[in-house]
């Protein structure tokens, strides 16, 4: 696919991800494993690359080592042809300080924009699960003559109170941008639906540069893209909404069209995994016309089931061994071992976990390299689990990496 040389893509990957603790205790949220083989950042990078955008800067900050390593190992493009996906940590170009917000992160990285001199700049988040062809959004942005275009997700109006909400006119021009309003405005064609901001933006380059510089001089600003930059451009009449429901991705089905999940909490992260494992999944990882790319599994052998080991309604990644154990309604990352008599149900298991002989694990997320001892019981006795582990509001047992339980 031809590289779109007049567009620079910036992926915001510097957030701490506190609500996803303990899985962000030692890594940035975009580096959290997802769906067996992937990291969260693989979804946005796949969308950009599949659409032909090969100049991508990933702005990082907190606990970025595993994220930087993943990008370096999994996302190598040809520098000889001007293609790159590069992690960019805080450079402290404007003083000895870290990024103070998403807008400040881009402001401190404007040298990248000046080097490329793009006409348009894509600014996407790094921690959502979805498929999207961003080229369609770019074309709508150009057609509208917008300064910024904001991707809008149609959600039931009663659920929109949890989002930044867009009020737009019949021509998709944004009239208001409201943060978690008690009375969300509806979309023009449906009184029961609102536009929630997806945190994905397309800017005319000079518009973004000017807005960032103005924002940097505002002492009352939090220097946030959604909270400060977008409202500034809305007030000027330069902001438009892009209706995500109009986006078409090759190979999509009616069931997974328009799928988008913010997995910023443990319960949302868990439920997004459960979306993957039905016979006709709500989100289909097997769409090869718009693949989710990664090199995470390397040269691992196929999963192996021995001594009557079984897995039902589950995803089991390469290198796993199920030996006379049972796995149901679960997602297993690579190199997971389930020993004889062990039972795993309704779980998300990250790489390198060993479930010991006769252990029972229910309704849990277990991070990398955890060893569950023989005969251990997790997710059955909540009172006992609360004394040992983190438990989400939805009752998901959370076990951090590199421990023996």
UniProtKB/Swiss-Prot annotation:
Any one GO molecular-function label of the UniProt entry: ATP binding
Keyword terms of this UniProt record: ATP-binding, Carbohydrate metabolism, Glycogen biosynthesis, Glycogen metabolism, Nucleotide-binding, Nucleotidyltransferase, Transferase
SUPFAM superfamilies: Nucleotide-diphospho-sugar transferases (SSF53448), Trimeric LpxA-like enzymes (SSF51161)
EC numbers: 2.7.7.27
Residues binding alpha-D-glucose 1-phosphate, per UniProt: 164, 179-180, 197
CDD domains in UniProt: ADP_Glucose_PP, LbH_G1P_AT_C
GO biological process, any: glycogen biosynthetic process
Reactions catalysed: alpha-D-glucose 1-phosphate + ATP + H(+) = ADP-alpha-D-glucose + diphosphate
Parts of the chain that traverse the membrane: none
InterPro entries: ADP-Glc_PPase, ADP_Glu_pyroP_CS, GlgC_bac, GlmU/GlgC-like_hexapep, NTP_transferase_dom, Nucleotide-diphossugar_trans, Trimer_LpxA-like_sf
Pathway per the UniProt entry: Glycan biosynthesis; glycogen biosynthesis
Highest rank taxon of the organism: Bacteria
Record keyword Nucleotide-binding present: yes
Known partners and oligomeric status: Homotetramer.
Family label: Belongs to the bacterial/plant glucose-1-phosphate adenylyltransferase family.
Official protein name in the record: Glucose-1-phosphate adenylyltransferase
Organism this protein belongs to: Corynebacterium jeikeium (strain K411)
């Amino acid at each position: 696919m031809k590289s779109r040389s007049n567009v620079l893509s910036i992926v915001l990957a510097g957030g701490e991800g506190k609500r996803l603790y303990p899985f962000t205790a030692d890594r940035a949220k975009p580096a959290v494993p997802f769906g067996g083989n992937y990291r969260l950042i693989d979804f946005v990078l796949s969308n950009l690359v599949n659409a032909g955008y090969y100049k991508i800067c990933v702005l990082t900050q907190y606990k970025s080592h595993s994220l930087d390593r993943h990008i370096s190992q999994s996302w190598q493009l040809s520098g000889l042809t001007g293609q790159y996906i590069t992690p960019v940590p805080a450079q402290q170009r404007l003083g000895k300080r870290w990024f103070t917000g998403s807008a400040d992160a881009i402001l401190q990285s404007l040298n990248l924009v000046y080097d490329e001199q793009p006409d348009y700049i894509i600014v996407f988040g790094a921690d959502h699960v979805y498929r999207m062809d961003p080229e369609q959004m770019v074309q709508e942005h150009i057609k509208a003559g917008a300064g910024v275009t904001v991707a809008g997700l149609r959600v039931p109006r009663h659920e929109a109170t949890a989002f930044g909400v867009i009020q737009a006119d019949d021509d998709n021009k944004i009239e208001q941008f409201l943060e978690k309003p008690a009375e969300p405005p509806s979309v023009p064609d449906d009184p029961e639906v609102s536009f929630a901001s997806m945190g994905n933006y397309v800017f005319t380059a000079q518009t973004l540069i000017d807005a960032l510089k103005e924002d940097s001089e505002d002492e009352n600003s939090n220097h946030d893209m959604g909270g400060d930059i977008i409202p500034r451009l809305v007030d000027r009449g330069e902001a438009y909404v892009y209706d995500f429901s109009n986006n078409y991705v090759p190979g999509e089905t009616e069931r997974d069209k328009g799928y988008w999940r913010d997995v910023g909490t443990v319960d949302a992260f868990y439920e997004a995994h459960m979306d993957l494992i039905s016979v006709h999944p709500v989100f289909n990882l097997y769409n090869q016309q718009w693949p989710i790319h990664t090199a995470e599994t390397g040269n691992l052998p196929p999963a192996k089931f021995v001594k009557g080991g079984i897995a039902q309604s589950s995803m089991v990644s390469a290198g796993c061994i199920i030996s006379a154990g049972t796995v149901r309604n679960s997602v297993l990352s690579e190199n997971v071992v389930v020993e004889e008599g062990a039972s795993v149900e309704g779980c998300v298991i990250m790489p390198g976990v060993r479930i010991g002989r006769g252990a029972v694990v229910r309704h849990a997320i277990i991070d990398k390299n955890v060893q569950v001892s023989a005969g251990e019981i997790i997710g059955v006795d909540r009172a006992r689990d609360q004394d040992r582990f983190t438990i989400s509001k939805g009752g998901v047992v959370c076990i951090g990496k590199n421990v023996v339980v």
